[in-house]
From Swiss-Prot:
Keywords: Cell inner membrane, Cell membrane, Membrane, Plasmid, Symport, Transmembrane, Transmembrane helix, Transport
Function of the protein: Responsible for the transport of dicarboxylates such as succinate, fumarate, and malate from the periplasm across the membrane.
Protein's cellular compartments: Cell inner membrane
Family: Belongs to the dicarboxylate/amino acid:cation symporter (DAACS) (TC 2.A.23) family.
Transmembrane as UniProt keyword: yes
Protein name: C4-dicarboxylate transport protein 3
Domain of life: Bacteria
UniProt cross-references to Gene3D superfamilies, sorted A to Z: Sodium:dicarboxylate symporter (1.10.3860.10)
Organism name: Ralstonia nicotianae (strain ATCC BAA-1114 / GMI1000)
Listed GO CC annotations: plasma membrane
GO MF, one annotated term: fumarate transmembrane transporter activity
Membrane-topology descriptor: Multi-pass membrane protein
Length: 447
């Protein structure tokens, strides 16, 4: 029994997290030197990140029977992302005003040392326009996009390539078959990499506690507690509501992806589980085209945890520096963040750059106040990353349910904990089929 429990990945990751905390407290200098353990794991995941997105998206689109549905899935996904991002920003705004974690700190922004955030404010001084964003979607070279792991550029090329293969018909069969085998091989590599997750969690947590210390948590514990509380509320209320509307149990789904959740807890990176999450969703009966389109784009357009953090951090700085903000001012903050929060996920330091750009554009909240966040930002990254991951997974499944791209029997079996080997063979779920038809007829799943 004990051996079986210890053999589960999420248990091993939890042990790694606990051991990392103990290491960071007992020997902080050694703990802060263990960062490479987590970095290597993240780099290994990023190594297969671009190939998986390219192959999965291309393969999924190439096998779609109705190209019109590709646009329908994309439009629904973008609308969903915008609505959920707004909910996340609004919830962060409401909770930070109710709890007021920065009230009473009475910080004079003029006396803060801003050297530590100079690189972020310098980057924020060159804001990206909407035209710049559109231009950045088109890769000058697909090799360059793959080398830089540029998610959006890879998605654009893979979508076009998939459409081209679909239009070629049987002539594209050799390429499609190759991509199928290639995808299976890369996912096999992912399985090997995931065995290192407990070691990565140990190193990442030992570094965090060893470098920043538990004292930084105590100093700004109210803000941290508020952040974690808000993320829990968002998952339980907002994502719970989405799951109910889509017709599946949120709690069963969270249990189904628990390995990925605990891996994110240890590594503080939502990117670290994207390949495994895509495989899990496909195993649960979600069609490959929907998984390939929604999961990668959700990283950029649907960072729910990041959105909660943005409004919370902005208002916290205002409270701590005694900067008065009217309701209109706060709604302006929300509106600006609704635009600036897009396209920043997955880039190191992007959260601080986005926040700095937002505060600078508003002109009311002192950018120097961001110094207050440096000490605990790393401790809040777990909450952001976990919420991002859960939000992306729930969103993908919900969108798939709404466009009729889920094999209901396989989904129910997965949520009930039936081993994949014991399930019935995959069946073809056509994206264009209405949900009622899929549930009633269960047409065969395209491979």
């Amino acid at each position: 029994m004990i051996r079986k429990t210890l053999g589960k990945l999420y248990v091993q990751v939890l042990i790694g997290v606990a051991a990392g905390i103990v290491q960071g407290v007992a020997a902080p200098n050694l703990g802060s030197d263990l960062k490479p353990l987590g970095d290597v794991f993240i780099k290994l995941i990023k190594m297969v990140f671009a190939p998986i997105i390219f192959a999965t998206v291309t393969l999924g689109i190439a096998r779609m029977e109705n190209m019109k549905e590709l646009g329908r899935v994309g439009v629904r996904a973008l609308v969903y992302f915008e609505v959920l991002s707004t909910f996340a920003l609004a919830l962060g705004l409401i909770v930070v005003n109710l709890v007021q974690p920065g009230q009473g700190m009475n910080v004079d922004a003029a006396h803060l040392d801003t050297k530590a955030i100079a690189s972020y404010t310098h980057a924020a001084a060159r804001p990206q326009t909407f035209v710049d964003f559109l231009l950045s979607l088109v890769p000058s070279s697909i090799i360059d996009a793959l080398a830089r792991n540029d998610i959006l550029q890879i998605l654009v090329f893979a979508t076009l390539f998939g459409i081209a293969l679909s239009r070629m018909g049987t002539r594209a069969r050799p390429v499609v078959d190759f991509l199928d085998v290639f995808t299976q091989g890369v996912f096999s590599i992912v399985g090997m990499i995931m065995r290192l997750a407990p070691i990565a969690a140990f190193g990442a947590m030992a570094f965090t506690v060893g470098k920043y210390g538990l004292g930084s948590i105590a100093a700004l514990g109210k803000l941290m507690a508020t952040m974690y509380l808000t993320c829990v509320l968002f998952v339980a209320i907002v994502l719970g509501g989405v799951a109910r509307l889509a017709g599946f149990s949120l709690w069963k789904f969270l249990r189904y992806i628990r390995d990925e959740i605990f891996t994110v807890l240890g590594t503080s990176s939502s990117e670290s589980v994207v390949p495994q999450l895509m495989r899990k969703l496909e195993s649960a009966g979600v069609s490959k085209p929907v998984v390939g389109l929604v999961v990668p784009s959700g990283l950029t357009f649907n960072p729910d945890g990041q959105c909660i953090y943005y409004t919370m951090a902005a208002i916290f700085v205002a409270q701590a520096t005694n900067t008065p903000l009217t309701l209109t001012d706060q709604l302006v903050v929300l509106g600006v963040l609704l635009l600036t929060s897009k396209g920043s996920a997955g880039v190191t330091g992007s959260g601080f750059i986005t926040l700095a750009a937002t505060l600078a554009s508003l002109g009311k909240i002192p950018v120097a106040g961001m110094v207050l966040l440096l000490g605990i930002d790393r401790f809040m990254s777990e909450a952001r990353a976990i919420t991002n991951t859960i939000g992306n997974a729930v969103g993908t499944l919900a969108i798939a349910r709404w466009v009729g791209a889920v094999d209901r029997e396989r989904l129910q079996a997965a949520l009930d904990g039936v081993p994949e080997a014991a399930q019935t063979p995959p069946q073809a779920v056509h994206v264009h089929a209405p949900v009622a038809h899929v549930e009633a007829a269960h047409p065969p799943l395209a491979h």
